[in-house]
Regions:
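Gly-rich Lys/Arg/Thr-decorated short loops/hinges at beta-loop-alpha junctions or inter-strand turns
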Residues: 1
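Active-site-proximal beta-alpha core segment in soluble small-molecule metabolic enzymes
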Residues: 4-8, 12, 24-141
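Alpha-helical packing segments of well-folded alpha/beta enzyme cores
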Residues: 13-16, 20
């Protein structure tokens, strides 16, 4: 049995992005390309959309981020997974953004900054209702 196929028409995708950008103004768009662009080819889609240098590509892991960077994508890349101390240097060296979703993440980043004098760019993740990941708006301490 042959399964369904999805085809991405690059020029239509580009036009859709341009329409969205015209409506949101100067707000940067985050394009989710984790899990190999949900099967559509993360590197292919990211390289095609990297004409807009303000476009931010989002992946799950440091490995996915490295695949994009090594494939020639120079745009900002955000890593969704929890911060792992063993890859923070690599994230900093490749100008990746890390996802800080818990107080422990910020404590680790502060420790890294105090010991090395640098840390990667940070994206603060707030729980918006799914109660899976992110700071709770109700917590103020």
């Amino acid at each position: 049995m042959i399964g369904p196929k999805a085809y991405i028409h690059k020029e239509r995708l580009k036009k859709n992005i341009e329409i969205i950008k015209s409506r949101i103004g100067s707000i940067n768009l985050m394009i989710i390309v984790k899990a190999n662009g949900y099967g559509h080819g993360a590197l292919i889609i990211s390289k095609f959309l990297s004409f807009n240098k303000e476009m931010i590509f989002c992946v799950f892991s440091i490995e996915e981020a490295m695949e994009l960077r090594e494939g020639g994508v120079d745009n900002p890349i955000l890593i969704f997974s929890r911060i792992q101390e063993n890859w923070l240097d690599l994230a900093y060296q490749n100008n990746f953004w890390v996802n800080a979703a818990h107080l422990d993440d910020l404590i680790l980043l502060r420790k890294i900054f105090e010991s090395k004098g640098y840390c990667p760019s940070i994206h603060l993740k707030f729980d918006t209702g799914m109660t899976r990941l992110g700071f709770d708006f109700k917590e103020r301490n």
